[in-house]
């Protein structure tokens, strides 16, 4: 970011950043009778650098310089294996895991010492994971269930960031090199039915996450960016819980006409029962598709309900409900033996004014958009 040409700013900022990554991935697949396996080895090296330089309007005064990412090197190497057994024509078991080694080094660790005195410049973490699953097919029905366990290392920003501005909640963020690994426990299940005319599937999963990493307001420290409302430091909650459920369905009304629908819901809470931010409210999608000879017609509705479980404590405000209606039509023909498709349509036909739970600053999404396209398939 370079805002040195904006005269209205009291302090101009120049914030370049670089991230360089190289690595390798190697896979091997094994298959014998009813047993199969995939073994994967991956490794990478990343260097993250971000600078922050402030220029006062009076250039005769001294400028301020800091590293937002203080030359952080990350090296990772991991080995994973996934095994599956067809125990019958109708059922299968999956079992696997991985073991990774994550190394971090901050070249200019003195920036981290301001908030975390004496923290070491280097840190090595062991990242294990395990998962198991079972699938069962009975005629038109399908069932599955699974369990998982895994570790996640803090990201570069979570561990070593220094006054990184988040425009969503308008806070400057400070990393913490002493954060523990996030430890996740997962349970998931699904059930479905499908025949020649229709299908319906329900999926549910639950996560219990120890040492959940999130930003909390700090009582010490002043914001660096003049737009900031405060400073947050990354810290670990004792735990967090995340629950997701979805329902998908499709139905062929007759040969030329079919419909699809989806309903999803998520809920996430911290160790005090408070809401976590960036969790989508109850949402839906529904569509109809009609085909007759070379003609096609599609219409769809999608939207979110009002965000009830939002999180003011983490800088989030409520997002109202919205619905978006889209329509389109197309015609397919051959032009000199080349398949050609002409399409016209409208997105957000009713010109709904809306933003989603994930849009920073509540900046509205696109309004009514009428389009046409020509596709030529050689």
Summary of predicted features, one role per range:
Residues 24-30, 79-85, 99, 132-138, ...:
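Residues on the lipid-exposed face of transmembrane beta-strands in outer-membrane beta-barrel proteins
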Residues 49, 102-114, 138-186, 206-229, ...:
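Surface-exposed extracellular loop regions of Gram-negative outer-membrane beta-barrel proteins
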């Amino acid at each position: 970011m370079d805002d040195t040409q904006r005269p209205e700013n009291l302090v101009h900022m120049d914030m370049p950043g670089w991230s360089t990554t190289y690595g390798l991935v190697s896979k091997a697949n094994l298959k014998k009778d009813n047993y199969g396996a995939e073994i994967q080895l991956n490794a990478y090296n990343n260097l993250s650098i971000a600078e922050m330089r402030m220029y006062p309007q009076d250039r005769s005064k001294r400028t301020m310089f800091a590293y937002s990412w203080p030359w952080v090197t990350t090296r990772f190497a991991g080995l994973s294996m996934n095994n599956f057994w067809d125990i019958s024509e109708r059922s299968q078991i999956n079992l696997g895991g991985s073991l990774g080694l994550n190394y971090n080094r901050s070249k200019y660790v003195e920036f981290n010492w301001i908030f975390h005195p004496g923290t070491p410049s280097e840190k090595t973490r062991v990242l294990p994971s395990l998962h198991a699953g079972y699938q069962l097919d009975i005629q038109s029905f399908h069932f599955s269930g699974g369990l998982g366990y895994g570790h996640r290392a803090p990201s570069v920003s979570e561990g070593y960031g220094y006054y990184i501005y988040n425009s969503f909640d308008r806070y400057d963020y400070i990393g913490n090199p002493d954060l523990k690994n996030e430890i996740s426990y997962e349970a998931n299940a699904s059930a479905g039915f499908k025949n020649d005319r229709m299908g319906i599937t329900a999926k549910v999963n639950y996560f219990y996450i120890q040492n959940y990493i999130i930003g909390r307001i700090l009582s010490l420290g002043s914001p660096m960016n003049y737009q900031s409302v405060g400073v947050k430091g990354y810290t670990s909650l004792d735990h967090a819980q995340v629950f997701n459920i979805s329902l998908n369905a499709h139905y062929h009304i007759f040969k030329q006409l079919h419909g699809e629908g989806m309903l999803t819901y998520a809920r996430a809470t911290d160790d005090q029962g408070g809401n976590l931010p960036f969790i989508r409210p109850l949402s839906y999608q529904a569509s109809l598709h009609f085909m007759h000879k070379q003609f096609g017609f599609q219409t769809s509705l999608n939207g979110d309900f009002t965000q009830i479980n939002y999180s003011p404590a983490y800088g989030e405000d409520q997002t109202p409900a919205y619905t978006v209606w889209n329509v389109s039509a197309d015609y397919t023909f051959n032009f000199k033996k080349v398949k050609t498709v002409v399409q016209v349509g409208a997105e957000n036909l009713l010109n709904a004014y809306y933003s989603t739970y994930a849009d920073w600053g509540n900046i509205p999404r696109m309004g009514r958009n009428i389009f046409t396209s020509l596709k030529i398939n050689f």
